UniProtKB/Swiss-Prot annotation:
A Gene Ontology molecular function term of the record: GTP binding
Annotated positions binding Mg(2+): S174, T194
Keywords annotated in UniProt: Cytoplasm, GTP-binding, Hydrolase, Magnesium, Metal-binding, Nucleotide-binding
Record's protein name: GTPase Obg
Organism phylogeny: Bacteria, Bacillati, Bacillota, Bacilli, Lactobacillales
Subunit structure: Monomer.
Family: Belongs to the TRAFAC class OBG-HflX-like GTPase superfamily. OBG GTPase family.
Keyword Magnesium (UniProt): yes
């Protein structure tokens, strides 16, 4: 049996922007010939694209790191460096992408060809031609390329099925799927024969068709991870109609109605929206002794829970092995699907703001100041660190420009307020300098 991998942890890193160039042309009466250094090219972004031909996340088990290429450096004659191509990563339909650090849903990929920028490539650094001013017509300033974004991700694949079969182990879900579709699930006379979801296409006599999933058997406590647990409960989320299969012969010694209540409790505990989906009760193994009596008792207990007869779920007595009652069940399922819309998987508040690019949603702080045990002042913060890595520390003019940027951000004043004195060491990353009051 082919393995079905439905979760994966990967890292993605977008490409760095190319460095800008410091260059001068040779021209009479123009200081240093005039600036002629071009900009660096943009780094490649990492883009996820849905491929309907993929069925599992198996590929991500062997390839966990995805890194886009960096942009080329700027060139002389004011020519820009070539931008790097984006890295396209193909994922199957039904893939949910989460930020591994925050647990936030970044995107839900369900349409063939759908694309999402998962990590944005860094912009290219500006060449010295960009920094020319009347006061400084020959600047020796160029920016380094901006680093590309790097993210740790959790991928989760929920199979795309219109109808999901749920129920205790060994109630006949796999057998039902095998006789109404071309799927060939593993069938055995023991619990948890199905340890991976099986998917089959069903066509009714009237010509309707839909995808049906045989999901691994649930047991009490599945929503807390007991048994096969939440790793397979997640697949039910995408179904529009649930077929609740019950062993009406009680061959395992359990009460059919108690089975029904127990499974619904697990669905409700896992996700309240699962109980919003219409359910059809499939009373299976009706060819077995005592099944008819058990069904009568089941209907009586079920009716006691409803005030109105019309609110009762539909019940279809069948025997998968004997091929009895299947046509009526499938026709009713197709009719219910036709009038059932898709359900939202997540609250809007749970989703990262969805633009063409899915970036970090947190408000970016300009900088933070801490102090090490050796009394060194440490500057950090996304904006400040980005300015730092884009500064060419080998050129004095670039360093002076960076110092002006720090002053404009209020870093100097903040250091003074914290008690920094003339000559104190200040560190940004691995770069250290003396504070000048």
């Amino acid at each position: 049996m082919s393995m079905f991998l439905d979760t994966a942890k990967i890292s993605v890193q977008a490409g760095r922007g190319g460095d800008g160039m410091v260059a001068f042309r040779r021209e009479k009466y123009v200081p240093n010939g005039g600036p002629w250094g071009g900009d660096g090219g943009k780094g490649g972004s990492v883009i996820f694209r849905v491929d309907e031909g993929l069925r599992t996340l198996m590929d991500f088990r062997y390839n966990r790191k995805f890194k886009a290429k960096s942009g080329e450096k700027g060139m002389t004659k004011g020519m820009h460096g070539r931008g790097a191509e984006d890295l396209i990563v193909f994922v199957p339909q039904g893939t949910t992408v989460r930020d591994a650090e925050t647990g936030k849903v970044i995107t839900d990929l369900v349409e063939h060809g759908q694309e999402v920028v998962i990590a944005k490539g860094g912009r290219g650094g500006r060449g010295n031609i960009r920094f020319a001013t009347p006061r400084n017509p020959a600047p020796e300033i160029a920016e380094n390329g901006e680093p590309g974004e790097e993210r740790q991700l959790e991928l989760e694949l929920k199979i795309l099925a219109d109808v999901g079969l749920v129920g205790f182990p060994s109630v006949g879900k796999s057998t039902l799927l095998s006789v109404v579709s071309s799927a060939k699930p593993k069938i055995g006379a023991y619990h948890f024969t199905t340890i991976v979801p099986n998917l089959g296409m069903v066509r009714t006599k009237s010509g309707d068709s839909f995808a049906m999933a045989d999901l691994p058997g649930l047991i009490e406590g599945a929503s807390q991870g007991i048994g096969l647990g939440t790793q397979f409960l997640r697949h039910i989320e995408r179904t529009r109609v649930i077929l609740h299969v019950i062993d009406m012969s009680a061959s395992e010694g359990r009460d059919p109605y108690e089975d029904y209540v127990s499974i619904n409790n697990e669905l409700e505990t896992y996700n309240l929206r699962l109980m919003e989906r219409p359910q059809i009760i499939v009373a299976n193994k009706m060819d077995m002794p005592e099944a008819q009596e058990n069904l009568k008792a089941f209907k009586k207990k079920l009716a006691a829970q409803y005030d109105e007869f019309d609110d009762l779920p539909m019940i279809f007595p069948i025997s998968s092995l004997a091929h009895q009652g299947l046509e009526n069940l499938l026709e009713a399922t197709a009719e219910l699907l036709a009038k059932t819309d898709e359900f939202l998987l997540y609250d809007e508040a749970d989703l990262v703001d969805e633009e063409a690019y899915y970036g970090f949603a947190e408000t970016e702080k300009d900088f933070e100041i801490t102090r090490d045990d050796d009394a060194t002042w440490v500057l950090s913060g996304e904006k400040l660190e980005r300015l730092f890595v884009m500064t060419n520390m080998e050129r004095d003019e670039s360093i002076m420009k960076f110092a002006r940027q720090l002053r404009g951000m209020g870093v100097d004043e903040a250091l003074r307020e914290r008690g920094a004195k003339d000559g104190d060491l200040v560190r940004i990353g691995k770069f250290e300098f003396e504070f000048v009051d």
